[in-house]
Design a protein with these regions (language model features):
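Conserved catalytic core of two-metal-ion nucleotidyltransferases
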Residues: 2-37
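Right-hand nucleic-acid polymerase module
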Residues: 23-168
Length: 168
């Protein structure tokens, strides 16, 4: 480790970055939840995504900041993330290792119900359940957006993506 200029730190019982226990028991790490063979997302990160989706619909409802077209683009970005300057951003990109597809279908259903409540054509909305596969495909265009149509900077967009993730 010295050759790599890395320092080995003592294991701290009260540390929030390390823990020990039986590997057969559920545990959480970096926003993920591991339980048997299921890799999911920690509950706080799921709730944060729901809250951010609701926030987006509320801003649209109150006609704050964007048109219907921009709302749909922003919602799709929230669902799929995107590639900016060759780097993948977004909730689904961060949690691309999950195999909890039930969670993704529940999120899709929540978005569908919200679209119905706000008179948004759900056919125009991308799906969490598809994005998980598309994020792993280097040739996909599912994550391609014309970001110049948005009234925000790339930097602000990246910060919005980080706001969706609760990994601490």
């Amino acid at each position: 480790f010295e050759d790599l200029k890395l320092t080995i730190h003592d294991f701290g019982i009260n540390s929030n970055k390390s823990s020990f226990g039986n590997i057969n028991e559920p545990f959480e790490f970096l926003g993920y939840k591991f339980e048997d063979k299921l890799i999911s997302v920690r509950e706080t990160s799921i709730q944060k995504m729901y809250a951010n989706i609701i926030k987006l619909f509320t801003l649209y409802k109150n006609k704050k900041y964007f048109s219907k077209e921009e709302f749909i683009t922003r919602l799709n970005l929230k669902i799929t993330g995107c590639v900016i300057d060759g780097k993948k951003y977004g909730w689904i990109s961060f949690f691309s290792l999950i195999n909890d597809y039930t969670l993704l279908f529940m999120l899709d259903k929540f978005v569908e119900k919200s679209c119905k409540n706000f008179n948004i054509n759900y056919e125009e909305i991308k799906k969490f359940s598809r994005a998980i596969y598309e994020i792993k495909d280097p040739n996909t265009n599912y994550l391609t957006y014309d970001l110049s149509t948005l009234k925000t900077s790339k930097t602000k967009l990246v910060y919005d993506f980080y706001d969706d993730i609760d990994f601490y």
